[in-house]
């Protein structure tokens, strides 16, 4: 664990970084890729086994494993930004499922969590959704994890260890739950990919998904733009499956959000991840 003084310093740096490069406050989520791009980094997704990510200090490059889950990739990007802001120099991050004991890795992880999930943003959206953290349900935690672009486990870790918004009992009860069971309880169809439940509470950010993921929205929403989603039938809600890379929009009379679909396990430069693959 970081000492309180150092933790406060890192929180301040994370919030300052958001404000300086994206001009946003602590009450909205951010896309770490957009932030890295605004900071002048080249972001590349690469296929390297046992590799999580790398920050190349002298070259202004962030490398991210193309083979990891999307939530993990976004956290890795924020983690590598942390290495830069905290002055750690060039760092290679290998896959360590239980976390690293190295001080610089703990600092970069803490920075990433506070960059992506400031307490003000979590409290705002939980209020919009009517979420009570003392009674947090698995489906609510899953929905919020997708909103902040984190894995289910990373979201719970941030809630308990860093933000102190849930109890140990809640953390312990939610963490072992299998994602396929949560998804089955949320969708009338079997979803192999991730599920994004969206609505008027989903504000200030695009819906970033991969081919094979699903969006659940209210029945009164309209879809605009290229046909990159396949609408599936349901009695109560609209369900869309992402079938092709591209950018479009989902909206109704009082809400709207852009949808950005990337190729599954895309490798290459970040700015091309939403483009069709050339044969």
PLM region descriptions:
Residues 1-279:
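Active-site hotspot residues in diverse enzymes, especially metal/ion-binding acidic/histidine motifs
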């Amino acid at each position: 664990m970081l000492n309180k003084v150092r933790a406060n310093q890192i929180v301040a740096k994370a919030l300052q970084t958001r404000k300086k490069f994206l001009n946003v406050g602590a009450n909205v989520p951010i896309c770490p890729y957009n932030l890295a791009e605004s900071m002048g980094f080249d972001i590349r997704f690469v296929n390297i086994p046992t590799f999580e990510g790398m920050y190349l200090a002298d070259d202004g490059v962030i490398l991210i494993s193309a083979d990891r889950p999307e939530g993990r990739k976004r956290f890795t990007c924020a983690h590598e930004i942390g290495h830069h802001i905290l002055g750690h120099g060039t760092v290679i991050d290998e896959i360590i499922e239980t976390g690293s004991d190295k001080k610089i890795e703990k600092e970069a992880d803490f920075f990433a969590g506070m960059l992506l999930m400031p307490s003000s943003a979590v409290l705002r959206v939980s209020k919009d959704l009517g979420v009570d953290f003392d009674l947090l349900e698995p489906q609510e935690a899953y929905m919020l994890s997708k909103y902040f672009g984190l894995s289910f486990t990373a979201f719970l870790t941030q809630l308990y260890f860093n933000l102190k918004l849930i109890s140990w009992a809640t953390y312990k009860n939610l963490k072992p739950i299998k994602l396929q069971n949560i998804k089955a309880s949320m969708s009338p169809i079997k979803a192999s990919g991730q599920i994004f439940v969206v609505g008027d509470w989903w504000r200030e950010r695009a819906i970033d998904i991969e081919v094979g993921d699903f969006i659940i929205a209210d029945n009164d929403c309209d879809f605009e733009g290229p046909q990159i989603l396949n609408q599936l039938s349901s009695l109560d809600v609209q369900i869309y499956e992402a079938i092709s890379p591209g950018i479009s929009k989902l909206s109704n009379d009082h809400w709207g959000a852009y949808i950005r679909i990337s190729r599954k396990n895309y490798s290459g430069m970040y700015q091309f991840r939403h483009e069709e693959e050339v044969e």
